Swiss-Prot record:
It is found in: Lysosome. This is Lysosomal protective protein. InterPro entries: AB_hydrolase_fold (IPR029058), Peptidase_S10 (IPR001563), Ser_caboxypep_his_AS (IPR033124), Ser_caboxypep_ser_AS (IPR018202). Heterodimer of a 32 kDa chain and a 20 kDa chain; disulfide-linked. The active site is at residues 177, 399, 456. It catalyses: Release of a C-terminal amino acid with broad specificity. Protective protein appears to be essential for both the activity of beta-galactosidase and neuraminidase, it associates with these enzymes and exerts a protective function necessary for their stability and activity. This protein is also a carboxypeptidase and can deamidate tachykinins. GO terms for molecular function: serine-type carboxypeptidase activity. PANTHER family: LYSOSOMAL PROTECTIVE PROTEIN, SERINE PROTEASE FAMILY S10 SERINE CARBOXYPEPTIDASE. Pfam families: Peptidase_S10 (PF00450). GO terms for biological process: proteolysis. Belongs to the peptidase S10 family.
Length: 479
């Protein structure tokens, strides 16, 4: 009798679970298949799809899924997220490690010999809603770390409803920059869902800890010759005590003034914050510029966030009522923007006609975003406690937005058992032989790795090294 009383609710639960994936089944995604992609001299031999996944509430997140060129059925599924917050993951596809890269003419796509879909099925997701082609029916784009993690989780579940043939494949979560927050917060949700075959996560030049990022950046800037002895001496005097320096949230007025100067040198002087040794696209920028009726700003708000003038400046812009466009510093987004706003391309990608133009980053999403976490320590410790996930934090070593030293300090602070001492890792460059590609140290279930000479966008700067690293990560090989 007791069992009989429970049986109808169990049936109802099963029905609800089935209804959640009701549109699924192999072939349900056929309407999203990209049949012809403009810009290619020859259409690809692998399948690719573009459409929408259901996020939380009325959010619809745009995805572009490229199947593996190796063997889709046995290759892992890899989620990729770019950061911002408020910037599009299509930047990763079209300028970093996608199967084809946009050319300067904004029309032509060229095949990428170091594409990550050579060995994996890669899902590029534009997140959160309001970014790129993603939208929300209620047009509410103010969000936070927790909401974004949940919405990305819902979208990932919807992906496996749409592509049930991939449910059993190994799943890896990867991303870059502010995805240093997105990926571990999402992974903590995914690890609790036994229907997903989560195997690991990798974050490139990620924001793992605001404090360690700020503190390390000042050392990075000084020892790369950017600050000079006068400023360095003043920083040591006013920001440090007993061999401990606080460059993150120091309230001492002279220290704050010094850090304003450091922030200007690193982010606003004309140096390329994403690659110290690369030129600044468009030349030395002004802090704010105008394009017709639009104010163009370039600060994504991830370094020295506690400086008071930064907060005042951001709120003034938000209240101004002016039309504001967010354009990351020293980057040229014209080619990708021209391509993705071409009507033929939008039609090929199944983008609704009523959606606004695609931009790399969305100012409103960025400026209204609530940063709930100052560090990802608890998330990584939770993932590491499972003792079954392969985790990689990798950094191009000439990036200043999320510098290698801060992420190395962060990994060290997790206090995991050291398995391989810091050593060079090698890439075979054919005729020039094996070369040192960077340095790696490995702990139990987590590794930290640098890519020599790469900036914030590692696959753009060092594509062969990036693919080699990615392959070793997926295949659980020594780096």
């Amino acid at each position: 009798m007791f069992r009989a009383a429970l049986w109808p609710p169990v049936l109802l639960l099963l029905q609800l679970l089935l209804l959640a994936c009701a549109p699924g089944g192999e072939g349900a995604h056929d309407q999203d298949e990209i049949r012809f992609l403009p810009g290619l001299a020859k259409q690809p031999s692998f399948r690719q799809y573009s459409g929408y996944l259901k996020g939380s509430g009325s959010k619809r997140l745009h995805y572009w899924f490229v199947e593996s060129q190796k063997d889709p059925k046995s290759s892992p599924v890899v989620l990729w997220l770019n950061g911002g917050p408020g910037c599009s993951s299509l930047d990763g596809l079209l300028t970093e490690h996608g199967p084809f890269l946009i050319q300067p003419d904004g029309v032509t796509l060229e095949y990428n010999p170091y594409s990550w879909n050579l060995i994996a099925n890669v899902l590029y997701l534009e997140s959160p809603a309001g970014v790129g082609f993603s939208y929300s029916d209620d047009k509410s784009y103010a969000t936070n770390d927790t909401e974004v993690a949940q919405s990305n989780f819902e979208a990932l579940k919807d992906f496996f409803c749409l592509f049930p043939e991939y449910k059993g494949n190994e799943l890896f979560l990867t991303g870059e920059s502010y995805a240093g927050i997105y990926i571990p917060t999402l992974a903590v949700l995914v690890m609790q869902d036994p229907s997903m075959n989560l195997q690991g996560l990798a974050v490139g030049n990620g924001l793992s800890s605001y404090e360690q990022n700020d503190n390390s950046l000042v050392y990075f800037a000084y020892y790369h010759g950017l600050l000079g002895n006068r400023l360095w001496s003043s920083l040591q005097t006013h920001c440090c005590s007993q061999n401990q320096c606080n460059f993150h949230d120091n309230k001492e007025p002279e220290c704050v003034a010094n850090l304003q100067e450091v922030s200007h040198i690193v982010a606003s002087s004309g140096l390329n914050i994403y690659n110290l040794y690369a030129p600044c696209a468009g030349g030395v920028p002004s802090h704010v510029r105008h394009e017709k009726d639009t104010v163009v700003v370039q600060d994504l708000g991830n370094i020295f966030t506690r400086l008071p003038l930064k907060r005042v400046w951001h709120q003034t812009l938000l209240r101004s009522g002016e039309k504001v466009h967010l354009d990351p510093p020293c980057t040229n987004t014209t080619a990708a923007s021209n391509y993705l706003n071409d009507p033929h391309v939008r039609k090929a990608l199944h983008i609704p006609e009523q959606l606004p133009r695609w931009d790399l980053c969305n100012f409103l999403v960025n400026i209204q975003y609530r940063r709930l976490y100052q560090s990802m320590c608890s998330q990584y410790l939770k993932l590491l406690s499972a003792q079954k996930y392969r985790i990689l934090l990798y950094n191009g070593d000439v990036d200043m937005a999320c510098n290698f030293m801060g992420d190395e300090w962060f990994v060290d602070s997790l206090n995991q058992k050291m398995e391989v001492q810091r050593r060079p890792w090698l890439v075979d460059y054919g005729e020039s032989g094996e070369q040192i590609a960077g340095f790696v140290k490995e702990f139990s279930h987590i590794a930290f790795l640098t890519i020599k000479g790469a900036g914030h966008m590692v696959p753009t700067d060092k594509p062969q090294a990036a693919l080699t690293m990615f392959s070793r990560f997926l295949n659980r090989q020594p780096y």
